[in-house]
Regions:
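Short aromatic-cysteine micro-motif
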Residues: 124, 128-131, 155-348
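Single conserved hydrophobic/aromatic residue that forms the stacking wall/gate
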Residues: 373-382
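Extracellular repetitive beta-rich solenoid segments
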Residues: 25-57
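Cytochrome P450 core scaffold surrounding the K-helix E-X-X-R motif
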Residues: 361-369
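Short, intrinsically disordered N-terminal pre-domain segments
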Residues: 1-17
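Short linear proline/tyrosine/threonine-rich motifs used for host-factor recruitment
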Residues: 50-52, 78-80, 187-191
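Acidic glycine-/aspartate-rich tracts in secreted/extracellular proteins
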Residues: 46-48, 140-142, 177, 246, ...
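GGW-centered surface loops in extracellular recognition modules
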Residues: 57-136, 142-144, 239
Length: 382
């Protein structure tokens, strides 16, 4: 990802238009200049709003952070920190769908539907021909506090007390990754929105015993951790599996947004009386009958990668739009469910097993009663 304000292009220096767009977006939220005096600075007032004043801004947990708190004996969660941020979700709202080539964002997608035209009228191809499709996650800070009887999970744009972990900006595939075969026969990863009738891209475990239409346009599965690393390396050294810190960062954003550890809680698109999100992302595809799923396509991925684009989810989350799969049930009727989407990321949980870089869970006995978790230093070259 290129986050430099000035970059080289065809041997010439130019301003990075994407960084300028981000700056312009931020300037829209500045207060007007009425009553501003010489020497005034931009501060956050007691209500959590940007304002001009003479006092230096000192970020605190109350004015510059938001999070959740729960007791150690149960998961009874309350919101803590700046209530305005809980309503406006400034960090979560900076997750944006984009098309990117290697480490550079080519353009951001329409936030209300990625298949929709951009502001300049351009209709983006989402099949990988113009670049990979992903979600750009912004830089922010997060930390976990132990108060003795309670835990706290915080996020902020500031390392308030020096204990926050910096989450560098990164791009995550908009769904579990697909693969394609190059001319030299090697398989490489790519991220795109592929329709179910696109015969070029066979997903799942590519089994010849499964009808091709039940695998087309789906993520790649049925491979080992080493194979996944190999497919990433075949694409280039700029792409890796998601690492443990990034995975935790995404989970933290969702936990705090809904003030709920149960991502699968029932969908509720209404806000609370305080203007907060509630509920969860819904069950997604976790409620599939295992035997029926096995009979349908051998427990390969169910939802095509084009689904969010087709339903204009954009940068949003689960909205109740249903996914219908013809002739799925034993009586010939259709499967009807709705996939779990978080901020444009399709199947945020529960569809297939996920590899996470830098963490290994080792089962110590055959009954899986005791497991050890080993976390190594992040290896992603930020």
């Amino acid at each position: 990802m290129n986050f430099n304000l000035v970059e080289m292009y065809n041997g010439l220096l130019r301003f990075n238009k994407h960084i300028l767009n981000e700056l312009a977006e931020g300037l829209k939220h500045l207060p007007n200049l009425d009553g501003v005096s010489k020497g005034d600075s931009l501060i956050i007032n007691e209500q959590g709003n940007p304002a001009w004043g003479s006092a230096a801004f000192i970020p605190t947990f109350e004015n510059a952070a938001y999070g959740i708190e729960w007791t150690k004996d149960d998961n009874d969660i309350i919101r803590i920190g700046n209530a305005k941020f809980h309503r406006e979700l400034p960090i979560q709202n900076r997750l944006k769908g984009c098309v990117y080539n290697e480490k550079k964002i080519s353009y951001f997608l329409n936030p209300t539907g990625w298949a929709k035209p951009l502001e300049n009228g351009f209709v983006p191809p989402l099949d990988g021909s113009d670049g990979d499709v992903g979600v750009r996650v912004p830089e922010f800070y997060m930390c976990v506090k132990d108060t003795g009887t309670k835990y706290q999970l915080w996020i902020s744009d500031f390392n308030i007390d020096g204990t926050f972990t910096r989450v560098y900006p990164f791009i995550i595939s908009h769904t579990k990754t697909m693969t394609r075969t190059r001319e030299d026969g090697k398989e490489e990863v790519f991220s795109a929105c592929i329709k179910h009738d696109d015969t070029r891209y066979l997903g799942g475990n590519k089994s010849s015993s499964v009808v091709a239409t039940k695998l087309q346009g789906r993520p790649r599965t049925g491979i080992s951790y080493d194979k996944a690393n190999e497919f990433c390396a075949n694409r280039g050294d700029w792409i890796t599996m998601i690492d443990y810190l990034e995975y935790c960062a995404l989970q933290a954003l969702c936990y705090i947004e809904y003030a709920n550890f149960d991502n699968q809680a029932a969908l509720n698109t209404n806000l609370t009386s305080d203007g907060f999100k509630q509920g969860g992302l819904g069950a997604g595809v976790t409620n599939l009958n295992w035997e029926r799923w096995t009979a349908f396509n051998g427990n390969n991925p169910i939802v095509q990668t084009y689904w969010t684009a087709e339903h204009n989810i954009g940068n949003g989350s689960t909205n109740g739009d249903h996914y219908e799969l013809g002739n799925y049930n034993t009586d010939g009727s259709n499967l009807n469910t709705y996939p779990a989407v978080y901020r444009g990321i399709l199947n945020f949980f529960g569809d297939i097993w996920t590899f996470i870089r830098d963490v290994a869970i080792i089962n110590r006995n055959t009954n899986y009663n005791l497991s050890l978790i080993h976390i190594s230093e992040p290896t992603r070259p930020y």
